[in-house]
C-alpha cells in the first residue's frame, strides 16, 4: 500500500492557526473558536463527529467512515489549535509510544 501524503494535515492545521489569529466573520473555524459557548462548542463538535464516525463504522459504510473520520480529524485539529497544542507535540508523543511498544 502506498504511503499517504499527510502534509494536508499540516496545511489544514496552519489554516486553522491563521484563522485563530486573523478573524474572518465568514470562516467556520473563526465561528467555532469565537463561539459564545467557548471551548464547549468545540467539544460538542468533536463529540458529535465521534458519534457519527462510530455509527458509520457500525453501519459498515466505507464512504461514510472516511467522510465522518475526516470531519472528526478536522474538529480535533481545531481543538488542538484552540489549546495551543502543535502537531509536532502529537507526533512526538506517538513516536515515544511507538518506540516504547517496540521495546516491550
Curated annotation (Swiss-Prot):
It catalyses: 1-(5-phospho-beta-D-ribosyl)-ATP + H2O = 1-(5-phospho-beta-D-ribosyl)-5'-AMP + diphosphate + H(+). It comes from the Archaea. InterPro entries: HisE, PRib-ATP_PPHydrolase-like. The keyword Hydrolase applies. Pathway: Amino-acid biosynthesis; L-histidine biosynthesis; L-histidine from 5-phospho-alpha-D-ribose 1-diphosphate: step 2/9. Coiled coil: none annotated. Keywords: Amino-acid biosynthesis, ATP-binding, Cytoplasm, Histidine biosynthesis, Hydrolase, Nucleotide-binding. Its EC number is 3.6.1.31. CDD domains: NTP-PPase_HisIE_like. One of its GO terms (cellular component) is cytoplasm. One of its GO terms (biological process) is L-histidine biosynthetic process. The keyword Hydrolase applies. Signal peptide: none annotated. GO terms for molecular function: ATP binding; phosphoribosyl-ATP diphosphatase activity. It is found in: Cytoplasm. It is an enzyme of class 3 (hydrolase). Belongs to the PRA-PH family. PANTHER family: HISTIDINE BIOSYNTHESIS BIFUNCTIONAL PROTEIN, HISTIDINE BIOSYNTHESIS BIFUNCTIONAL PROTEIN HISIE. This is Phosphoribosyl-ATP pyrophosphatase. The lineage of its organism: Archaea, Methanobacteriati, Methanobacteriota, Stenosarchaea group, Methanomicrobia. The gene is hisE.
Amino acid at each position: 500500500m502506498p504511503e499517504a501524503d499527510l502534509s494536508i494535515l499540516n496545511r489544514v492545521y496552519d489554516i486553522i492557526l491563521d484563522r485563530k489569529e486573523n478573524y474572518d466573520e465568514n470562516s467556520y473555524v473563526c465561528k467555532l473558536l469565537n463561539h459564545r459557548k467557548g471551548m464547549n462548542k468545540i467539544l460538542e463538535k468533536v463529540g458529535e463527529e465521534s458519534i457519527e464516525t462510530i455509527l458509520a463504522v457500525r453501519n459498515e459504510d466505507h464512504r461514510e467512515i472516511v467522510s465522518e473520520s475526516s470531519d472528526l480529524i478536522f474538529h480535533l485539529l481545531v481543538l488542538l489549535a484552540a489549546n495551543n497544542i502543535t502537531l509536532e507535540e502529537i507526533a512526538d508523543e506517538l513516536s515515544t509510544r511507538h518506540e516504547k511498544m517496540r521495546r516491550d
